[in-house]
Structures are given as C-alpha cells and as structure tokens.
Amino acid sequence: MVKLVLVNPQIPPNTGNIARTCAATGTELHLVGPLGFELGDRYLKRAGLDYWPYVDLHYHNSCEEFITHWRGQGGNLLGFSVTGTVNFWDYTYQSTDWLMMGSETDGLPQMMRDLSTQLLCIPMPHSEVRSLNLASSAAIALFEAGRQLRSLG
C-alpha cells in the first residue's frame, strides 16, 4: 500500500482524523516536523479516537531526515498541491508511492515540491475555493490510490 506523508501539519484534529483514516486503510503515516502541536495533544488524540494502536506512525524531525528515510526505501514521492500539474485521477499509482501533503496554512515547502517525482492536484471546479481541508484531501488521495491498486490486482 502507498504511504502518506504530512509535512509540517498545524491542526491537531486534522492529523488525528488522517491517522484514523490511515488505521482504517492500513497505510503508514509519516509526520515530518516541525509540527504545529505536540504528539500528546488532546485534540490530536481525540480525533484519532481509540485507533492510535492501529496507526503505523513514523515521525521525522525535519524534511532532511525524512528525505534520508525515503531515499533508503525508494518509491515515487508524489506531492499534492493546488498548483499541481497532474490530475490525481490521471496518475497511475504504484504500491511503493509516497503521497505527500503540506501544512494547512502553507502547503508543501518548496524544497519538497522540487523533490517530488510528480506534483499532483485534486481538481476543484469552483475557483473561489482555494483548497480542501487537509484531512479530506488525504482521504480522497488514499482512497483513489487504493481503488486503482485493487483494480490492478
């Protein structure tokens, strides 16, 4: 299954919700610091409910630390951004892909955008809407990748 990477997430309930989605889908969750909260934050724990024991959680102190880990594992690093040039529906996912999303306020740091194998976007037909909620985006991306990978085999 693909892996999910959150770079500098800021809002504990979003990350908790994403952790619950990762538990439900069997997806590794990689958090890249600095975070906008402590891992013991009560809102983070509450959003993840009692599913935390089922979350395959990995914490990296910095982008550089994560990059070293990712390079050791291999696979495509897929950045998600409102300015992405490839529609996420049109991308053919592989089980070794890493789906990477940035913070709720700043998106992906430029160095992570530059490192991405592809920069994907989730289309939004209403230009007045700047972005989707991070937890919603993560769920949309994970379930599309999962749908494609199940249909392949």
From Swiss-Prot:
SUPFAM superfamilies: alpha/beta knot (SSF75217). GO terms for molecular function: RNA binding; tRNA (5-carboxymethylaminomethyluridine(34)-2'-O)-methyltransferase activity; tRNA (cytidine(34)-2'-O)-methyltransferase activity. InterPro entries: Alpha/beta_knot_MTases, SpoU_MeTrfase, TrmL, tRNA_m1G_MTases_N. GO terms for cellular component: cytoplasm. S-adenosyl-L-methionine binds at residues 102, 122, 131. Pfam families: SpoU_methylase. It catalyses: cytidine(34) in tRNA + S-adenosyl-L-methionine = 2'-O-methylcytidine(34) in tRNA + S-adenosyl-L-homocysteine + H(+); 5-carboxymethylaminomethyluridine(34) in tRNA(Leu) + S-adenosyl-L-methionine = 5-carboxymethylaminomethyl-2'-O-methyluridine(34) in tRNA(Leu) + S-adenosyl-L-homocysteine + H(+). GO terms for biological process: wobble position ribose methylation. Keywords: Cytoplasm, Methyltransferase, S-adenosyl-L-methionine, Transferase, tRNA processing. Its EC number is 2.1.1.207. Belongs to the class IV-like SAM-binding methyltransferase superfamily. RNA methyltransferase TrmH family. TrmL subfamily. This is Putative tRNA (cytidine(34)-2'-O)-methyltransferase. It comes from Synechocystis sp. (strain ATCC 27184 / PCC 6803 / Kazusa).
